[in-house]
């Protein structure tokens, strides 16, 4: 769930995106999000107006489908723009879905014009992709393809000059440090298992856990 003033925004497994007034718990608007939505919605404020960024996974669509990434007017529910990406999914009792599973990054400082999304099972069943989209029109500013898919949410960090970097974990256990402006990988470290948790960062230290049950503290420099 994401909130702005008295408004709460959330989505469900059926793909419905909703806005509720917290003062009276009455719905303000709702729209069809196309498929299951697990990634937390994010909010960016432009000219004192909230805009919601979100996207769906590939679940009810079957083994192959579309992840639709949206920018939505937070007051009216109007879709400002929408971008489609074809992704794959493993369905069944042991489902491992693709599409947008990770919460996006709303850029700040020198990447203020970007919303950055990580997609699972994009460009190949076990692969993934990261996309920096222009907040204004949804056009791709840069993209980075990965050999492994990502469920872990990317995290943005900034140096003293305001230069943005993205930290991204993947399904093979790699933790990447990425130049937020250009999308180039600056450094990578291999941990001992699939990274599904999202890193927590304080100053120049990040903490993240793997599916093998290990918690790591990693220094960024």
Regions inferred by a protein language model and the residue ranges of each:
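Extracytoplasmic/lumenal domain signature
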Residues: 2-221
């Amino acid at each position: 769930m994401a909130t702005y003033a008295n408004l709460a925004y959330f989505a469900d497994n059926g793909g419905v995106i909703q806005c509720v007034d917290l003062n009276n718990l009455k719905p303000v608007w709702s729209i069809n999000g196309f498929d299951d939505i697990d990634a937390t919605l994010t909010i960016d404020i432009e000219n004192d107006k909230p805009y919601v960024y979100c996207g769906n996974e590939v679940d009810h669509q079957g083994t192959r489908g579309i992840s639709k990434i949206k920018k939505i007017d937070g007051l009216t529910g109007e879709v400002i723009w929408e971008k489609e990406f074809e992704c794959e999914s493993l369905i069944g009792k042991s489902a491992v879905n693709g599409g947008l599973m990770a919460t996006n990054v709303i850029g700040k400082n020198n990447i203020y014009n970007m919303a950055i999304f990580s997609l699972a099972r994009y460009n190949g069943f076990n692969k993934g992709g990261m996309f920096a989209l222009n907040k204004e029109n949804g056009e791709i500013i840069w993209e980075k393809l990965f050999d492994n898919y990502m469920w872990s949410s990317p995290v943005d960090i900034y140096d003293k000059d305001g230069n943005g970097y993205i930290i991204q974990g993947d399904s093979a256990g790699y933790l990447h440090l990425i130049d937020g402006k250009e999308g180039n990988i600056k450094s990578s470290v291999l941990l001992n298992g699939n990274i599904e948790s999202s890193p927590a960062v304080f100053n120049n230290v990040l903490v993240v856990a793997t599916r093998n049950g290990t918690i790591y503290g990693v220094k960024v420099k």
